[in-house]
């Protein structure tokens, strides 16, 4: 939040790519309005959340039920080290857990999405370096309650997946600021 405040107070736009609430609070919206500066971003969804955002709609579209989704990441870079601390992991965990709730809506399909188990873990593993490995175990059920499983092993680099999004947002927020647009 300090960086967002400092940027806006100095008359500079602010872009956030991490899954936290830095720009999701009324005080930041008010400051952006007051300083006539644009703010953007929340979660670039470059790893496991990207997988969930892509695969959960398949489950919903096919009206498959969900019994559980277990996700774990191993990271070897500074992100992994920081997120290995429970206090630092909490915001990321909330973001990752809310992804399924926003796609597989229990009120719309209570028999399929009301009572599933969802667990998210991030582990620091220095040999992995800047690479990230995400493992997802998804327990689903189909017609007549027939149980099935999906296993996903996603090896990626956050920096490679995030860089194009970051560059696009920087260009867009610069264009917005030059055009006199501000706020969220």
Each predicted region: which residue ranges?
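Conserved active-site and cofactor/substrate-binding residues in soluble primary-metabolism enzymes
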Residues: 2, 23, 49, 53, ...
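Structural motif
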Residues: 12-14, 37-38, 64-65, 137, ...
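C-terminal active-site/capping subdomain that shapes the small-molecule cofactor and substrate pocket
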Residues: 141-184
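Charge-patterned, long linear interaction tracts outside catalytic cores
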Residues: 94-156
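Glycine-rich beta-alpha junction loops
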Residues: 45-47, 70-77, 131, 142-146, ...
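N-terminal Rossmann-like NAD(P) cofactor-binding subdomain of oxidoreductases
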Residues: 1-53, 57
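Generic secondary-structure signature for well-ordered alpha-helical cores
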Residues: 33, 37, 56-64, 145, ...
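Conserved anion/nucleotide-ligand pocket segment
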Residues: 40-42, 46-115
């Amino acid at each position: 939040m300090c960086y967002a405040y400092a940027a806006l107070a100095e008359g500079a736009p602010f872009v956030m790519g991490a899954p936290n609430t830095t720009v999701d609070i009324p005080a930041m919206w008010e400051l952006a309005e007051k300083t006539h500066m644009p703010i953007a971003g929340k979660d670039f969804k470059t790893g496991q959340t990207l997988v969930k955002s892509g695969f959960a709609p398949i489950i919903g579209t096919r009206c498959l039920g969900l019994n559980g989704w277990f996700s774990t990441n191993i990271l070897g870079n500074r992100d992994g080290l920081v997120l290995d601390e429970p206090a630092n992991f909490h915001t990321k965990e909330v973001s990752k857990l809310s992804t399924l709730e926003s796609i597989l809506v229990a009120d719309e399909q209570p028999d399929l999405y009301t009572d599933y188990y969802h667990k998210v873990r991030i582990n620091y593993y220095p040999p992995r370096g800047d690479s990230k490995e995400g493992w997802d175990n998804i327990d689903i059920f189909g017609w007549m309650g027939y149980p099935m499983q999906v296993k996903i092993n996603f090896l990626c680099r956050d920096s490679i997946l995030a860089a194009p999004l970051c560059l696009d947002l920087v260009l867009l927020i610069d264009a917005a600021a030059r055009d006199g647009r501000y706020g969220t």
